Amino acid sequence: MFKIIVSFFCDHVFLSVIWLISCVLMIFFTLKDILFCTQFISIMKLIRCINYDRCLLIIDARTEKCFLKGHIINSVNIPYIDVKSVCNISVFKKYKNFSIVIVFKNDNQIDRNYVNFFKSIGCNKIYILRGGMNGWLSNNYPTVCLK
C-alpha cells in the first residue's frame, strides 16, 4: 500500500504538491482560531451587543482617514499602526471587564500583535468582528461619519 502511494506521488509530483498545500491550508484555517486563541463575533451578534450590552467597547483599528469616512456607532479609533504609542495603559484598566470588539478593515488584515497588546494589559474578553468593516458596509448597516 505504501509503495503505491509513493509511486503515485513520484508519478504526479505537481498534483501531489498542490494536494499537500491544500491540506495544510485547510488544516491551518480550520485550527486558526484555536491556535491564536481569538474569538470572532458575527455582525448580528455585535448588533445585539450594541443594543443591549452596556459593558462593550468597540475599537476601530483602521486608519483615522478610514474611521472618519464611516465607523460603527460608539466606536473609538485606535489605529493598529501606533497602538502602543497612542494608548495609555491605565485608560484601559477600567475596561478590563468589558467585552472588547476590535474592528479591522477585513478578515485578511487582522494584526495578532494588536490583539495581543490588549491581552497583555489584562483585557480578557476580546473579539474580532468577522468580515471587519467591509462586512459591515457590504450588509448596508449604518455608520457614523465625522467630517
Curated annotation (Swiss-Prot):
Domain of life: Bacteria
Rhodanese domain ranges (all copies): 52-145
Record InterPro entries: Rhodanese-like_dom (IPR001763), Rhodanese-like_dom_sf (IPR036873)
Gene3D superfamilies in the cross-refs: Rhodanese-like domain
Protein name as catalogued: Uncharacterized protein bbp_050
